[in-house]
Amino acid sequence: MTRDERAGGNVPTHGGAALVGFAPGLAEIAPYRIDDWGRYPACHMGPAKLWELRNRVQAAASGELGERPAGIVITHGTDTIEETAYLLSRTLDPEVPVAITGAMRTSSDEEWDGPGNLTDAVRVAADPGSRGRGTMVVFAGKVLAGWQATKIEATALEAFGAPHGEPVGEVAEGRVEFTVGAHSCARRPINPPGLTARVAQIPMVVGDLGEMLDLARKSHDGVVVEAFGSGNVPPGAVPAIRRWLAEGKPVVLATRCPRGEVTPVYAFPGGGATLVRDGVIPAGPRTPSQARMELLICLSAGLAYGG
């Protein structure tokens, strides 16, 4: 991104060659080739584009685009890195490592973090210890499992974390150090033909009567409900949730809390235990957006939530 005064803000500008030019010394880490797939703001990445990118990465990893690489680096807008990282983690063979990175500042800023993050990502992708770890997010010196990584800061340089885990490694002084085994990064892949299902994500609000749930039910195949606390919703929303279930459409229950996961212990109307007894599915160790990606992938593959 660069600052465009006529547009009044930051816009996508640099292709792969330009980004590499800003990070001298990459060839000393590993030989590379550049694939300019596209220049899209992260918030423009819908299911079709996500799947197109996934297929491009799979083709590169299998050697269809040239010599089979030791690793792959993706530069990506930070807003939706977590969706892309989750998708790749769940649908690609983990043998060839994929390192996703980006920047929280633009090349117009003095403290641009892009070149440093790119260099770190190349180090991770090229490191022999990355083999079998699948997709990782490399940002501000942290290495995060792709299926756990989420954006936790809107503007800070250290923008990514793993609310349901911990970093799996770090890059410090040019060295990649992993703190856990490869099994902690990789997931068993699911292979849908595409992202064909439609999944809604609906946050609960105080006094919710389920209107948004009813509106979404007509055009979606499943829904992630972003509940309070350990998985509780206002009683007024319960009939709408039951209408989803009555139509055979899965309802996944996530929490709006930054840390922790749904624990169905409350049996009052709208309580998590009551909802699970009705057939609602706890999201597990996933943020609401990760739970939505999981449900989207599984429904597209004809599978139940959780693969």
Question: Where do the language-model regions lie?
Answer:
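ATP/NTP phosphate-donor binding region
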Residues: 1-62, 239, 259, 282
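Short beta-strand segments
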Residues: 74-76, 99-102, 136-140, 203, ...
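Internal gly/pro-rich beta-alpha loop/helix module
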Residues: 100-172
